[in-house]
């Protein structure tokens, strides 16, 4: 059983919610606070703060690409893209993702946050995100530049959607889920945004949004521990030099939200880093990170 640690207004969570809805994957929900501390999740995976996190038994995936692969039984082909599509995905999930927030006014952002979490938590959220970006290695675009980038992005989407209902063709694929969630976020921040988009794009967004409208049960703390206990998989693979299996290391994103997770190194290869962490219950869990975009010390 998949367990998703998420919160309603998280764009990357929406990416996985839509993917699981389309695939008909049964999953359970753990709704976490919009910003740390998150007592339950922190106790499992340490300092890593990005959301969502996907749990499959004793395996915890701290990246939506790794999570997508795990949901498809390790089938790497499920998210393989050609070079042109991969470049478009990278643009969507990096520059466009951040442009979404830069293109909106502060009033729009605060109004949305207030509607979701109330005034006090909205203020805490903004302060948290400002602190999160202090040691970031990325530079957000100005509002005008961000709006121009989003306009270009929507225009490119229209061209790509001219030949099918989805970017992948007749049914959604990995590229659809990656490119959808930035526009999903824009629609929440700016209610009038979609009225300015071509109908091919608005209809595609509506089709994608419908995929995540599935009811799920809440995972109890007991169910979480039971899921861990029922998984005896130990991902003991290659550890590339100069590191050795069992080294106590820290892993953190290299661009933003650079809080670290500490554990024992069990996998280090070209694609991923996996740490083992012991819980107070005596159980072991395995926390998976992508190799690209993360620092290992």
Where do the model's predicted regions map?
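N-terminal short leaders/motifs
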Residues: 1-12, 206-222
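GST-like fold's C-terminal all-alpha helical module
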Residues: 92-206, 210
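Short, flexible, glycine/charge-rich loop motifs used to bind or transfer phosphoryl groups or to couple energy/partner
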Residues: 43-44, 167, 239
């Amino acid at each position: 059983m998949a367990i998703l640690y998420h919160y309603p207004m998280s764009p990357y969570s929406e990416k996985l919610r839509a993917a699981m809805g389309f695939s008909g994957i049964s999953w359970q929900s753990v709704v976490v606070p919009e910003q740390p501390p998150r007592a339950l999740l922190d106790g499992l995976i340490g300092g890593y703060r990005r959301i969502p996190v996907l749990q499959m038994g004793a395996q915890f995936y701290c990246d939506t690409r790794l999570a997508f692969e795990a949901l498809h039984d390790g089938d790497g082909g499920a998210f393989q893209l050609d070079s042109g599509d991969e470049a478009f995905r990278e643009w969507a999930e990096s520059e466009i993702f951040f442009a979404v927030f830069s293109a909106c006014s502060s009033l729009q952002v605060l109004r949305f946050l207030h509607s979701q979490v109330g005034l006090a938590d909205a203020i805490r959220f903004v302060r948290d995100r400002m602190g999160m970006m202090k040691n970031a290695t990325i530079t957000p675009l100005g509002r005008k530049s961000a709006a121009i980038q989003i306009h270009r992005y929507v225009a490119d989407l229209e061209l790509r959607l001219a030949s099918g209902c989805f970017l992948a063709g007749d049914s959604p694929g990995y590229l659809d889920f990656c490119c959808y969630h930035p526009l999903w976020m824009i629609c929440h921040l700016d209610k009038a945004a979609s009225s300015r988009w071509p109908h091919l794009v608005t209809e595609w967004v509506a089709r994608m949004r419908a995929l995540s409208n599935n009811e799920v049960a809440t995972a109890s703390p007991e169910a979480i521990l039971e899921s861990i206990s029922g998984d005896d998989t130990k991902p003991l693979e290659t550890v590339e030099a100069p590191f050795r299996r069992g080294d106590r290391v820290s892993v953190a994103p290299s661009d933003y939200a650079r809080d670290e997770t500490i554990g024992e190194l069990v996998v280090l290869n070209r694609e991923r880093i996996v740490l083992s962490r012991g819980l107070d219950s005596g159980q072991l869990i395995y926390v998976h990170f992508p190799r690209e975009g993360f620092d290992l010390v």
